């Protein structure tokens, strides 16, 4: 994959960059693995705004992704590499030997025609899924479970990979993309390799309309709102905030930790790197 740049033939083209989609081998998705998505506009069941900056965007269908990889011992052939509008990574369509079809995240190096499998006895090969206890130390992995059998929850975005650093007792020590060192049960499964679409981080949206197509609404500064809408709002003309920077709900915004304590904190060996 590469990033395409354009000559500035218009203001909208001046800064915009696109993926060249060279790795995509099939345009139409597998219909049996599609589900409709109902847009929420960031509202909950009561109709109240709970997530800002969401709404609009192009209509999408959800691709059902196999995050559990629980068809052990049955080989699958990669039929195609496809675009998924719901995530930054590409997805791969697998045709299993028993006739079933499933989507998985497409790692770097996975090509059409390659055979992949899952289970404790699978080979250490890109795209194969195994329990952490069966993966050699030092291997790069993605699509990692936090609880055995629950399905992968970590390291799923484009270009992401974690490294298996050590094994001790019933836990494996993983270095996550954030720099965090975390213990995960060795019975949890992970997929060998790095998530594909490596150049995703280098793509520039470039214009407001493209954000709207993606379902991202504008971010408005609190300073330009009215006092009823934001603690920073109001005043005559341009003026300072007049208080410590705050969220729209009045909580301190700069440098205040918002993460609550969890029982699983004991499994974090080292916190993530500071930005």
Swiss-Prot record:
It comes from the Bacteria. InterPro entries: NA-bd_OB-fold, Rib_uL2_dom2, Ribosomal_uL2, Ribosomal_uL2_bac/org-type, Ribosomal_uL2_C, Ribosomal_uL2_dom3, Ribosomal_uL2_RNA-bd_dom, Translation_prot_SH3-like_sf. GO terms for biological process: cytoplasmic translation. Keywords: Ribonucleoprotein, Ribosomal protein, RNA-binding, rRNA-binding. SMART domains: Ribosomal_L2 (SM01383), Ribosomal_L2_C (SM01382). It holds the Pfam family Ribosomal_L2. GO terms for molecular function: rRNA binding; structural constituent of ribosome; transferase activity. One of its GO terms (cellular component) is large ribosomal subunit. Residues 222-275 are annotated as: Disordered. The keyword Transmembrane does not apply. Gene3D superfamilies: 2.30.30.30, Nucleic acid-binding proteins, Ribosomal protein L2, domain 3. The keyword ATP-binding does not apply. Belongs to the universal ribosomal protein uL2 family. Part of the 50S ribosomal subunit. Forms a bridge to the 30S subunit in the 70S ribosome. This is Large ribosomal subunit protein uL2. It comes from Desulforamulus reducens (strain ATCC BAA-1160 / DSM 100696 / MI-1) (Desulfotomaculum reducens). The lineage of its organism: Bacteria, Bacillati, Bacillota, Clostridia, Eubacteriales. The gene is rplB.
């Amino acid at each position: 994959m590469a990033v395409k740049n354009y000559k500035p033939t218009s203001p909208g083209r001046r800064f915009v960059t696109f993926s060249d989609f060279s790795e995509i081998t099939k345009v139409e998705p597998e219909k049996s693995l599609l589900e409709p998505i109902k847009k929420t506009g960031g509202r909950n069941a009561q109709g109240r705004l709970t997530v800002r900056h969401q709404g609009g965007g192009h209509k999408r269908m959800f691709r059902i992704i196999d995050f559990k990889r629980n068809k052990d011992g049955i080989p699958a052939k990669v039929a195609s590499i496809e675009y998924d509008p719901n995530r930054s990574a590409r997805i791969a369509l697998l045709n299993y030997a028993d006739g079933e079809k499933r989507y998985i995240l497409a790692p770097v190096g996975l090509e059409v025609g390659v055979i992949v499998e899952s289970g404790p006895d699978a080979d250490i090969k890109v795209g194969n899924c195994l329990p952490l206890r069966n993966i050699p130390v030092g291997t790069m992995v993605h699509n990692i479970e936090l609880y055995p059998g629950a399905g992968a929850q970590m390291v799923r975005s484009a270009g992401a990979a974690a490294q298996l650093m050590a094994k001790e007792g019933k836990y494996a020590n993983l270095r996550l993309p954030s720099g965090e060192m975390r213990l995960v049960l060795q019975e949890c499964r992970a997929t060998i390799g790095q998530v594909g679409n490596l150049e995703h981080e280098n793509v520039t949206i470039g214009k407001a309309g493209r954000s709207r197509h993606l379902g991202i609404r504008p971010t408005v500064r609190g300073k330009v709102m009215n006092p009823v809408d934001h603690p920073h709002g109001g005043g005559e003309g341009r003026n300072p905030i007049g208080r410590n920077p705050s969220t729209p709900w009045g909580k301190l915004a700069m440098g205040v930790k918002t993460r609550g304590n969890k029982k699983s904190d004991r499994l974090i060996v080292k916190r993530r790197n500071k930005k």
